[in-house]
Amino acid sequence: MKNTDFENPLEDEAECTLELQDNEWKFEYCDHDRQIARAIVFDDSGFFYFVRAVRDDDFGKSTLIETSGGGVEQNEDLTKAVAREVQEELGIVVDIVCKIGVVSDYYNLIHRHNINNYFLCKVTSFGEKHLTKDEIECFHLSTLKMTFEEAVKEYEKCSNSKLGKLIANRELPILHRAKQIMDSIISC
C-alpha cells in the first residue's frame, strides 16, 4: 500500500494499489479478467455494511463476509456500477466519497483475474434489495451492519476457508485504508 499524507484524502494520490496472488489453489492458466466495482459503505453513526454469503460450491463450504460489489456491465462506468451493486445487494442508496484504490487478485480455481475497484460510500437512504436468484438460493446473501472492529474480527474469523482467506487478504487492507480516510475527514 502506498504511503500518503492525509491532509487531503480525496486527492488521487490517496488511492492505494495492491497486487495479490491466489496461494490457495494451484495456478493452471488465466483466461479472463473481470472489472469489479466494490464499496466500503458506512453511515452517520460510523457503522459499516457488508454482505454475508453462505456457500457450498466449487470453492468449498464457507460462511463469508465481503464488501458489496460485482462486475461492471457493458457501457457502465465504475461509479454507476458501484452505486447499482450497493443498491441491489444491500438496498442502500449511497453517495461516493472517494475512490480508495484498486486490488488486483486471482481466483485460480476459475481461472480469473479480478480487478477490484474500491470506493468509500456513505449511506443516504435505505430501501429494498434486488438480489438475483443465485444470490438468494446459492449464496444466501444477507446484510451485516458492524463496527470497524467487529468487521475486522469477522474477516479474520471467516478466513478459515480458502475463499475466506483470499477475500480477507483483498479486503482487510482496503477496510483499514477506508478507516484512515474516514478518520482524516473527521479530523479536518
PLM feature spans:
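A short coil-to-beta-strand element that immediately follows conserved catalytic motifs
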Residues: 93-101
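Nudix hydrolase/Nudix homology domain
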Residues: 128, 134-188
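Beta-strand scaffold of nucleotide-dependent catalytic cores
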Residues: 50-52, 131-134
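Acidic, metal-coordinating catalytic segment for phosphate/diphosphate chemistry
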Residues: 2-40, 44
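Short, charged/polar surface micro-motifs in flexible loops or helix N-caps
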Residues: 42-47, 56-57, 73, 120-128
